[in-house]
């Protein structure tokens, strides 16, 4: 549950009902919320497999990494309907679209920029993957988790984090942000400070997408940089970068073409 963590199936029901409302409101998709009171990936896979034949598609919601990767990949193999984890792919698609637009405004080339991704959960990894597919070299993306920079040789990295490890001497966000062109935050409130923003490259792009409160507010950025493009995940600030502007329509398309 956003901002609260794993509180069980009943507590998550209002969130899932809200998701159903968004599917209907934005893409005219009739959906049924199903909450599974189990956090074992194999049990979740088995449950969805057994009910999947009665649905046109499955939208996975709020499953933590790395379980979400395991569950989605397995369900894609065994079901013949769309299986979509919007926390990963919806976020990645709309963030990459925002990045392309911001780079066009700033006249920067995607294969030359330096990106810092603060957060290493499902959405952060999906964004980094799509950035790479869109032309950002892997060596130009620094990913940071609770421990610090994900670098080659760091111990206790799982296979998903290891895929984003790079050769670097930077160990903290404060180190990595120096001369960065882009900051993508999918982490926690206050993670990016005004002093860090000052260290970024000319015409920086800042996507502070932590919910419910961003890593830094637009007002704080504007206090120290007049050349920054700033977006958040909130609808009450300009430039919203939130998977709501993507996932309903992606799922609508998948259903319409019977993918």
Identify what each model region corresponds to.
Residues 33-34, 59-62, 83-86, 117, ...:
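General beta-strand structural signal in soluble alpha/beta enzymes
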Residues 162-238:
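Rossmann-like adenosine-cofactor binding region
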Residues 10-18, 39-46, 66-70, 90-94, ...:
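Conserved active-site and cofactor/substrate-binding residues in soluble primary-metabolism enzymes
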């Amino acid at each position: 549950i956003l901002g609260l963590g794993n509180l069980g199936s009943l507590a998550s029901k209002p969130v899932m009902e809200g998701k159903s409302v968004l599917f209907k409101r934005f893409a005219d998709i009739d959906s049924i919320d199903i909450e599974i009171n189990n956090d074992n990936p194999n049990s979740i896979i088995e449950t969805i497999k057994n009910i999947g034949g009665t649905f046109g598609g499955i939208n996975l919601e709020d499953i933590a990494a790395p379980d979400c990767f395991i569950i989605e990949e397995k369900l894609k193999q065994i079901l013949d309907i769309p299986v979509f984890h919007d926390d990963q792919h919806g976020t990645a698609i709309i963030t990459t679209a925002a990045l392309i637009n911001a780079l066009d405004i700033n006249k920067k080339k995607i294969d030359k920029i330096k990106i810092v991704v603060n957060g290493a959960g499902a959405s952060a990894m999906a964004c980094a993957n799509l950035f790479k597919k869109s032309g950002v070299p892997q060596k130009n993306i620094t990913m940071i988790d609770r421990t610090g920079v994900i670098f080659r040789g760091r111990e206790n990295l799982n296979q998903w984090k290891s895929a984003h490890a790079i050769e670097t001497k930077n160990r903290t966000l404060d180190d990595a942000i120096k001369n960065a062109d882009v900051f993508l935050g999918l982490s926690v409130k206050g993670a990016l400070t005004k002093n860090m923003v000052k260290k970024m490259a000319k015409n920086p792009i800042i996507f502070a997408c932590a919910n419910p409160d961003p890593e830094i507010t637009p007002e704080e950025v504007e206090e120290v940089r007049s050349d920054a493009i700033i977006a958040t995940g909130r609808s009450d600030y300009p430039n919203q970068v939130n998977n709501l502007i993507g996932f309903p329509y992606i799922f609508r398309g998948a259903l319409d073409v019977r993918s």
